[in-house]
């Protein structure tokens, strides 16, 4: 599969729920490479995890659905409230969050890389259990599909239909 392509400049990393832990190593690597890193972590409530672990590598912002900590609402609400901008957005989390990230990135004309969370039965692309819709046609199969296990799990947001 493919991971995040690290780029220099301003980076906003967005993690929601179980998509938060994968962003920690990326935050560390980007910081070590000289990027200006901000992290937005989305939680349901004030039961925060990994926030302190991100702090050495990034400015950390939090959104909670219940408003108990940080911005009340979702990660996009937190980005807008804090006036964050980026050369590249990196995101991992639930599908509704990724849809919001994709729409926000398109609105701001900013590159976004998203990591899809899909069940992967075989892990080698044979079973097609992890297929997602893509915006381009595969030259071999002539369909609009990508295998998350082989072609992803990270995609440019504009390359997939969520």
Regions from the PLM with identified roles:
Residues 1-119:
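FNR/FR-type flavoprotein reductase catalytic core
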Residues 22, 95, 118-153:
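Local cysteine-cluster metal-coordination motifs and their immediate loop/turn environment
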Residues 50, 71, 145, 151, ...:
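Glycine-rich, flexible loop/turn motifs
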């Amino acid at each position: 599969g493919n991971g995040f392509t690290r780029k220099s400049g301003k980076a906003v990393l967005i993690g929601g729920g179980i998509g938060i832990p994968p962003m920690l190593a990326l935050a560390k690597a980007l910081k070590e490479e000289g990027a200006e890193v901000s992290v937005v972590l989305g939680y349901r409530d004030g039961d925060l995890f990994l926030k302190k672990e991100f702090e050495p590598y990034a400015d950390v912002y939090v959104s909670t659905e219940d408003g108990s900590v940080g911005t009340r609402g979702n990660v996009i609400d937190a980005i807008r409230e804090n006036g964050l901008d980026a050369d590249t957005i990196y995101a991992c989390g639930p599908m509704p969050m990724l849809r919001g990230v994709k729409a926000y990135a398109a609105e701001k004309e900013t590159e976004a890389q998203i990591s899809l969370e899909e069940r992967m039965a075989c892990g080698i692309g044979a079973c097609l259990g992890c297929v997602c819709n893509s915006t381009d046609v595969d030259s071999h199969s002539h369909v609009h599909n990508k295998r998350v296990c082989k072609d992803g799990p990270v995609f440019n947001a504009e390359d997939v239909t969520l």
